[in-house]
């Protein structure tokens, strides 16, 4: 038995926007959701993911502990 007037409103057609563009509609407690990243533009899901290794962790480790590559 749910209590009256304590539960948030449910919006079954809440709109999700990314960069001002409508992405999808979902059920939510807010009528509109604005997101920065979603599966359509996330590098992992789009296949454009790059491994960023600015200094080279292995090289930095080897230099720190004075290990020579053979």
Swiss-Prot record:
HAMAP family found in the cross-reference section:
Ribosomal_bL31_1 (MF_00501)
Q: Which organism is it from?
A: Pyropia yezoensis (Susabi-nori)
Instruction: Please give the superkingdom of this protein's source.
Output: Eukaryota
Q: Which residues form a coiled coil?
A: none
**Per its database record, what is this protein's job?**
Binds the 23S rRNA.
Q: Which NCBIfam families has this protein been placed in?
A: L31, PRK00528.1
Q: Which InterPro entries match?
A: Ribosomal_bL28/bL31-like_sf (IPR034704), Ribosomal_bL31 (IPR002150), Ribosomal_bL31_A (IPR027491), Ribosomal_bL31_sf (IPR042105)
One of the record's GO molecular function terms: structural constituent of ribosome
What's the protein here called? Answer: Large ribosomal subunit protein bL31c
Q: Which family does it belong to?
A: Belongs to the bacterial ribosomal protein bL31 family. Type A subfamily.
**Keyword field:** Chloroplast, Plastid, Ribonucleoprotein, Ribosomal protein, RNA-binding, rRNA-binding
Pfam families annotated for this entry? Ribosomal_L31 (PF01197)
Q: Which residue spans traverse the membrane?
A: none
- GO CC term, one of those recorded: ribosome
Keyword field contains rRNA-binding: yes
């Amino acid at each position: 038995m749910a209590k009256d007037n304590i539960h948030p409103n449910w919006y079954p057609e809440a709109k999700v926007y990314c960069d001002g563009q409508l992405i999808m509609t979902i059920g939510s407690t807010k009528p509109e959701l604005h997101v920065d990243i979603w599966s359509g533009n996330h590098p992992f899901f789009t296949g454009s993911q790059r491994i960023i290794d600015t200094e080279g962790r292995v090289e930095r480790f080897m230099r720190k502990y004075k290990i020579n590559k053979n």
